[in-house]
Amino acid sequence: IAIEGPIGVGKTTLANKIAETFNYDAFLEQPAENPFLKNFYKNPSQSALATQLFFLFQRMQQIEDLKQRSLFENVRVADFLIEKDRLFAEVTLSNEEMVLYEKVYEHITLDAPTPDLVIYLQAPIEILKARIVKRGNINEQYLTLDYLERLNDAYSRFFLDYKSAPLLIINAADINLESNESDYEALITMIMSNPCLLYTSPSPRDLGK
């Protein structure tokens, strides 16, 4: 299972909760390992390419580690798709940097396993910003509404034509998956009762009524 969406929407929270509920393995991004990320938040134009390339190589290594494990090991819940790397690059990099990024990208093999289900969490930028402020990551406070809007738009375009795996689209604006158990249980009910639904955009809160 892969969970996707823009910064602050609740990907990692949901991945950890699903992993705990079903005794799955959480397969998470490791942004704290990126030595360029702090400077990127403060001054994106100076550190964008280095930040993006580090994430690209990091995700490549994570995918390789995943593929080397036994197919009979436990189910994994990831808080990212490998395709997000190019998505972030298109939002973050200048035209010149994007040319260099593409040259690196085309020489890397990213044969990631196809998820059995992708959950795309959506929320407007005001909600994203409020959640980013609430979780208190000092460096993330530099993220602007303009950046979040461009990122949100990029995600919407990406998933508009996404057909690689079953896709469940969730409006995460009015739900609290971290502390409201009824919201979380409604989402789990939706997933379990519709395991192969494509391009569905219900509200877990509505489902629980």
Identify what each model region corresponds to.
Residues 3:
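Hydrophobic anchor at the beta1->P-loop junction of P-loop NTPases
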Residues 199-204:
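Conserved small/polar residues in nucleotide/adenosyl-binding loops
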